[in-house]
Amino acid sequence: MVDIYGRSLGRVIGIERNAFGELEGVQVEAAGGLIVTAKARQLGLTPKLITLTPDWKLEAVDIISELSLLRKRIGALESLKDTKEIEGEIYTELLDSQKVGYYDKVKTAEALSASMKHRLSEIGGQISSLTRYLVNAKLDHKSGELDEESLKLAQGSIEPTLHPLIAERNDLTGSLRTLEEVLPSRVTVSPTRQ
């Protein structure tokens, strides 16, 4: 099993099914014997490979879609009110129900944004460390302290880890930017006019 960035995650050791026999998730034995559970919606299946999409990525797509839809619905509701196509009482009732859903999604999105920023920080630290090791190996090679074969060994050890981290960082950055675009800087709804 690999993630969408190409990193090996381990081997599948168990499959979870619901009462109807549908796939619910899999258990993966990761490095060090750690058992990790992946939900079915995270899995991409091909004849030769199972690919795992990070949960944050799926959640971000869902939340972005839901927040965008809720904003459109609130805007449409206000438009109906402004053109007097609905009564004030119905407007207030519908607006209150939309606001509750919107506020809940905003809170969920803010929590997801915070966890994505934390992951981005972790990845940034790992990329920085690996890049430093790679630069030091190249520096040692240029100064004659490290032979060509040792440099290739160092590069062969570092680069397969570095490239997926860079891909994940770029993916996280893009998803975070899109998520923050749909998050309001502050939440306001125009006062009720009847």
Residue ranges and their predicted role:
Residues 1-187, 191-193:
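Peripheral interaction segments used for macromolecular assembly
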